Curated annotation (Swiss-Prot):
ZnF segments: RING-type: 173-226
Function, as annotated: RING-finger E3 ubiquitin ligase which catalyzes the formation of both 'Lys-48'- and 'Lys-63'-linked polyubiquitin chains. Plays an important role in virulence by acting as an anti-apoptotic factor.
Keyword Protein transport: no
KilA-N domain location: 21-131
Gene name, Swiss-Prot/TrEMBL: OPG021
InterPro entries: E3_ubiquitin-prot_ligase_p28, KilA/APSES_HTH, KilA_N, MKRN-like, Znf_RING, Znf_RING/FYVE/PHD, Znf_RING_CS
Protein's name according to its UniProt entry: Host range factor p28
Main location: host cell
Reaction(s) this enzyme catalyzes, per UniProt: S-ubiquitinyl-[E2 ubiquitin-conjugating enzyme]-L-cysteine + [acceptor protein]-L-lysine = [E2 ubiquitin-conjugating enzyme]-L-cysteine + N(6)-ubiquitinyl-[acceptor protein]-L-lysine
């Protein structure tokens, strides 16, 4: 049985997208909840809603040697901490349609999907995930030029952001010398990018520098190379992503 996108109903609750695949003639109903995490630019899929047994099996699997090794390698390859490869939404009245264990899509496609014994459900799940990613990553469009990105391009884009995150998490501010991603306050864990050079600063330090220069009547120069800048861009990465 082939996957048919026409049979997908899409809705959302808060930051969760809910995909319902309904094929009544074949008595197939599958609900997939997906979170797109903007902090590490990836997707997390609710395996509890697919089948509660999958969540229990996953928790047991990741405690075994094979599971631990896979999680370690995935964390290294994506630059995402192991603890951030999964997310949980609590079961309460507000979250009754979206609660459960969400895991990195790589774990679903390459590990969990093999635990599903129904090959038709396997095929539909894979189709739903690929369909969602393909339809939620687009190139900029103009009225006369509508272009969607291929699945291969999507993977390249995700890899690009993951590489950017991996490099960014090691960068230190050139003023306070702290690792930007390790600063105590969450609002400080951003870079302040200058339009004049590539020196690295956290957003807090460079804003204080900029404000002090303005108050004293001094020119807006980079604290390191003294090149004049016109603007500061707040960014989660150490440089702008094209």
């Amino acid at each position: 049985m082939e996957f048919d996108p026409v049979k997908i109903n899409t809705s959302s609750i808060d930051h969760v997208t809910i995909l319902q695949y309904i094929d009544e003639p074949n008595d197939i109903r599958l609900t997939v909840c997906i979170i797109r995490n903007v902090n590490n630019i990836t997707y997390y899929i609710n395996i509890t809603k697919i089948n509660p047994h999958l969540a229990n099996r996953f928790r047991a699997w990741k405690k075994r040697i094979a599971g631990r090794d896979y999680m370690t390698n995935l964390s290294r390859d994506t630059g995402i901490q192991q603890s951030k490869l999964t997310e949980t939404i609590r079961n309460c009245q507000k979250n009754k349609n979206i609660y459960g264990l969400y895991i990195h899509y790589n774990l679903v496609i390459n590990v969990v999907i093999d635990w599903i014994t129904d090959v038709i459900v396997q095929s539909i799940l894979r189709g739903l995930v690929n369909w969602y990613i393909a339809n939620n990553t687009y190139t900029p469009n103009t009225p006369n030029n509508t272009t969607t990105i291929s699945e291969l391009d999507i993977i390249k884009i995700l890899d690009k952001y993951e590489d950017m995150y991996r490099v960014s998490k090691e960068k230190e501010c050139g003023i306070c010398y702290e690792v930007v991603y390790s600063k105590r306050l969450e609002n400080d864990r951003y870079f302040g990018l200058l339009d004049s050079c590539n020196h690295i600063f956290c957003i807090t330090c460079i804003n204080i520098w900029h404000r002090t220069r303005r108050e004293t009547g001094a020119s807006d120069n980079c604290p390191i190379c003294r090149t004049r800048f016109k603007k500061i861009t707040m960014s989660k990465f150490y440089k702008l992503v094209n």
